[in-house]
């Protein structure tokens, strides 16, 4: 199999806002901007899906069983294809350094969204023990206006991170239950463990995109003879599973990845360096918007909808945050009711029960002076929690240009650049609200637009109860077509991937 961290940022996307929008009717312009914003949330999740399906769903049972005999150093190149159209390439190099290994992984990728081709580049360096356990790494992503760099080192039972985003470096420390792997370290370890049909392995994997460690599994399905070029080769078919997602790959006995297939039609094919980097072979791309929408019965005037009842099918829904607050979930049916605005309280929130939702994170830098100063300027001394939350919502809506950006959003970067989609709106709002003393969490799910449901993100604020709002749409509170599936940061939001391509929604009633 072949592992590439770069896929987790496959879809960093920028669309320049044209002055022709001013010639549109106000409602038509807003409809187009909203559709761009909800599309971009889905693209981030697509990047997570492909990264998980290809590159994190490989696994290891017995770390102690790995020996370095048979490890092959050198380079491996692949072309990346979308429905038979070449969209990029990936390159991995394994190097022996004394009693350890250095693994380099780089990828470049194009994606067509709404007629615009966007380019993403990632580079990962991983330094491991002789058994391919992670010692330290650095990860860089660059695309358009967005860039991020993460460095990490295993220190005892902690993974210590330096995260550079928005011009600021923050330190984070993550407790480890066991020594972790990066995705690109897995194949050498898997080869050493043995490719025997019927075997199943587990790997604890650290994902720089979500900054957490989770397990994945891989099973060796069959041993086959296939034709590769002008000759036959023995290959092993592997089924990779992560959180319900599956991908299939074929690798040779000595570890060459011949082919990989993901659930969304992305394919990696083994190529020479010259072939992999032949960018002139890229033909017309498939516009990703064709994969976004969840068809549904029509909802007239969704922004004014205060009650919605819908049937959700096609995928197991255990473990999602579908029940609670403004949602009632029974069987396969969810009801959403927009709450009346409560009286709220005086800022800052003084309870200790929601401290975690007032704290900064690596990407929600609510303790940074620039965030605090901006919140103070917006609120102008207003201490009423409801009014403050509403003012922040209106300011973020007005301040952030609706120029879609697929990235790993950072509040400081959004504050500086003032462009983005629903992820950027939600991240900046969350940072501003927390800095003002309003407990705030991020939600992800689906929202209805003119022709169906799209994946989307929005904040929820604590005003005596959790109130869903939407700074992307300037809704306070958010309309009832916002169906929440998860709450939490990016690591939790990526559970949405279980729904992609499977979820079906039937609107039963709305008003």
Question: How would you name each of these model-derived features?
Answer:
Residues 55-61, 229-237, 243-245, 249-250, ...:
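Hydrophobic/aromatic-rich core segments of domains that either
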Residues 16, 20-26:
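Short, positively charged and aromatic/hydrophobic N-terminal segments
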Residues 27-156, 163-167, 172-175, 186-350, ...:
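Acidic, serine/threonine-rich low-complexity disordered tracts
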Residues 5-8, 14:
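Short hydrophobic targeting helices and cationic amphipathic motifs
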Residues 2-4, 18:
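Position-driven detector of the extreme protein N-terminus
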Residues 183, 342, 348-420, 489-494, ...:
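Secondary-structure boundary elements
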Residues 84, 389-397, 429, 433:
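Conserved hydrophobic/aromatic pocket- or pore-lining residues that grip, position, or stack substrates
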Residues 189, 200, 409-414, 449:
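Acidic/histidine-enriched alpha-helical segments
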